[in-house]
Amino acid sequence: MASAETEARLRLLPKVELHQHVDGSIPAEVTWELMRHYRLHPVETLAEMRTRLELQPEEEGTLLAYLDKMHYPLWITQFYENVAKVTEAIVDAAAAVGVQTLELRYSPIIHTFAGLTPRQSIRAVLSGMNHASRRHAGMRLGLIVIAMRQHGPHIAKILARQAISEAQHLHARVGVVGFDIAGPEKGNPPRLFKSAYEIARLGHLGLTVHAGEDAPVDYVWEAVDRLGAQRIGHGCAAVGDPELLRRLARDEIVVECCLSSNYHTGAIKRGTPHPIQRFLEAGVPVAICCDNTTVSRTDSVRESARAAEEIGLEAVEAAHRAAEAHTFIHPETALRESDGE
């Protein structure tokens, strides 16, 4: 548990969030409000709704239980206005705890069941981010589009093209800044998505890959060698391969460390140190990230405090300063107020 002094210092620290999912970060009260608006009543109270959205202690340890918490938000994020609304709420919550640079990530394909196209789904998130940016002057915002592994390489290529169409460097507003694959790793190795990543690279999007969270170190190697990853999401498996650590350090490939989430999903076993310290000792750059603020009952201050218990407060402050150099957000448009959606 962080001291009050440490928490206050971290709250004032300009923080950089490079790995946060929209679906798992919608404030519970916003989901509850929209559920009631649509007369959806899976539970009777907000307190009960929280237990459905937030991972409970007895549920920790498996990725399946963790991902199941995304089920209820999907009920209400199939409509443009709702997606924009929840995105605004997420940005507001991040700003409230001192996040200065925020990259949200989002899988548009799973928000198309009520008729939105993937492009409209992407635009809905960007609309929410642009509206929120007007309230938070100086906050840097960008969106990473996710292709889900289980949907296959062809859909990933389609989404890469859709992402490029809304790329930040093509618009004078908050836009898409990166491309990612997520979802079940086992049976879906990164090499299958090489063509999609080549499209994203040619479109000047930043490249990050969920790898080594629930799969062996080979998947991290593939993300680096075959997909050209500039950042690795989670990357827990990499810590056991000295050669890979040297490669990550040499090429300054950032590991997006999500401490609470890694323990919650079982990627790191309870009672064992998080690999963030080993990454730093090997010279691998790290970013301290929330993953899913609602599911993991966390925020950037809490994650930073948790990391401070592993690596020390000064190292946490240094990590946030260094992470700014690895954001995919383009500086020439990052702070410009939007005139449109």
Label every PLM stretch briefly:
Residues 1-205, 213-222, 226-231, 237-254, ...:
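Metal-cofactor-binding active-site regions of metalloenzymes
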